[in-house]
Amino acid sequence: MSHISFKGCSFLSHLDSFQFDISSCQTIAASLVFATGGLFLLSRGLSFLRALFSIFILPGKSLSSFGPKGSWALVTGASDGIGKEYALQIARKGYNIILVSRSASKLSAVASEITSANPNILTKTVSMDFSENNDEDYEKLKDIIKDLDISILINNVGLSHSIPVPFVQTPEKEMKDIIAINCLGTLRVTQLVAPGMMQRKRGLILTMGSFGGLLPTPLLATYSGSKAFLQHWSTALASELEPYNIHVQLVVSYLVTSAMSKVRKASMTIPNPKAFVRSTLNHLGRSGGLFSYSHTSVPYWTHGLMAWGITSFLGAMSKTVLGINKSMHESIRQRALRKAARESGKKAQ
């Protein structure tokens, strides 16, 4: 009996030890979960502080660090909206301006506005339709700029869809125009300007990106793809030109009041061109809320916070973001189609 009792005690002893091991493992697992969660929250907290410092506190580089006053800035898509505002604000900082866009009359008006406000500033205008991708236009531009000290290039020219549209229904001309303007136009102008900057060992190249390139955007597939292309191209170019002391930066924006966005009223999340460009020029070299993307800036404060939140918690390429984007643009498309139907009905009457 005592022998049996001894074995029973031995079994109970092992059982207690086993239960203790399970309890210990559970405690360790819980500690690891809490530690991991704590590290995640700490990293996100530090990331948020970094974003706040970049957006609100740390100063950007001055334009004069990229080239002296009296040198030239070339701005594409300069006839109105963001491009016009870049030209006006850079001219006020003492740089001569080359205005490039399609409408000669609008370019002349912008040039007159610049010289009226800044009598010592020189301007040149180049009228060309980027959708044509015409070699003669680029040769003309090359001849005009060949002897100029261009220290700043603003790749602003761009085109989106007239309304959100499924890719298979996208008009062929619209599709080709978007690629010719957003991609080929930007590449060809940069290829004309960059060699001079490399010789002078200084310069600034800003290219307008978009949330549409950061986030895949259904019903704006061609536009979204063109802006995503610019994201990768600009970042790669930045690495190539960095040894020549040329700063290349993609500027990412959400909506800005403009003819292309079709938004007329400014709000906290949708600035007007003046406020957006001022923020961009004040944050040169700063990432805003998108520091996980090299050589990229989201300069306007609400856009920067939005970009930080999306990339930190949801993921720019996630199904959640994709679904939200799709629903939003499907709704915009339906409203646009209803508006077009109403206007067509009024004309028929």
Curated annotation (Swiss-Prot):
Catalytic reactions on record: a very-long-chain (3R)-3-hydroxyacyl-CoA + NADP(+) = a very-long-chain 3-oxoacyl-CoA + NADPH + H(+)
Positions contributing to NADP(+) binding: 74, 129, 137, 156, 223, 227, 256, 258
SUPFAM superfamilies tied to this protein: NAD(P)-binding Rossmann-fold domains
Swiss-Prot/TrEMBL GO biological process terms: fatty acid elongation; secondary metabolite biosynthetic process
InterPro entries the UniProt entry points to: 3_ketoreductase_fungal, NAD(P)-bd_dom_sf, Sc_DH/Rdtase_CS, SDR_fam
Active site: 223 (proton donor), 227 (lowers pka of active site tyr)
Presence of the UniProt keyword Transit peptide in the record: no
EC number from the UniProt entry: 1.1.1.330
Domain of life: Eukaryota
Family classification: Belongs to the short-chain dehydrogenases/reductases (SDR) family.
Protein's recorded name: Very-long-chain 3-oxoacyl-CoA reductase
Species per Swiss-Prot/TrEMBL record: Coccidioides immitis (strain RS) (Valley fever fungus)
